[in-house]
Structure formats: structure tokens, C-alpha cells
Amino acid sequence: MIRSVFTRDKPGTSDPAVGEALADAEMKFGNDIPTGTYLDMTANLPIVDPLKIKSPLLIVRGEYDGIATEVDLINFYTKLTVSDRQFIILPGLAHSLSLGLNRELFWHTMQAFLDMPPRVDSFKNG
């Protein structure tokens, strides 16, 4: 299961050794897991109500992500009521953005979002 996350969407977007290392590290906790919550999550996306989100939001999707389609995420994005929001599609990445070969694109995007200066709502003449 864990190994397949790195090969399921677009083989070649991550180093196979990363998937192997992660799977090996996780295997010490056992080699079987209940699928209920995972299947529930993927079958019932989205798992949050976009109308209830009030904080700044960054949605990042890898070009080859096989979990949620671009259309799924755009539909979610357009339902958001928070004005401080961004939607980014990163090229050359699949679902595991932070572990892919092009992970620097993900980390750059995250840093830019977190470093975004606050919004100015009005000019005050001093």
C-alpha cells in the first residue's frame, strides 16, 4: 500500500528508494491496516465543507495526482468564501508532493504562502 503511493499516479515522479525507505520504516508497526477510513476518505471527497473554512487557504495539487482531479479541486475552490486563498498546480509531481523529485517546487510554494505579507484593507492618510 505505502509503496504504491509513489508509483500509482505517474511512475518516475519520485525516487523509488524514497518509497522503499518509507515503507520499510512503516513496516515495523505491522503490515496490515484497516482500509475503512482510507476508503471512506477517498470515496467521500471532499471531507471538509468549503463554506466552513475561514482561514487563509492554499490548495496545492501535483500535475499527476490521482486522488482528486483538477476539476474536483476547482469545484471545491469556487465554493470557498474566504478571500485569502490560492490554488496551485505543480508540474512534474504526483500525490506525494513533499517527497517527489520536484519537491523543491512544493516547498517554495509553501514558503511563499507562509511569507505572504498581510492584506491592507484601506489607506490611512497620516
Predicted regions and their residues:
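Hydrophobic "lid"/C-terminal helical patch
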Residues: 110, 114
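Conserved alpha/beta-hydrolase "acid-adjacent" motif
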Residues: 66-72
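Alpha/beta-hydrolase-fold serine-hydrolase catalytic core, especially in secreted/extracellular enzymes
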Residues: 83, 115-126
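Alpha/beta-hydrolase
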Residues: 1-58
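Catalytic histidine-centered segment of alpha/beta-hydrolase-like enzymes
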Residues: 87, 93-107
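Conserved strand-to-loop "acid loop" that flanks and positions the catalytic carboxylate
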Residues: 54-65, 91
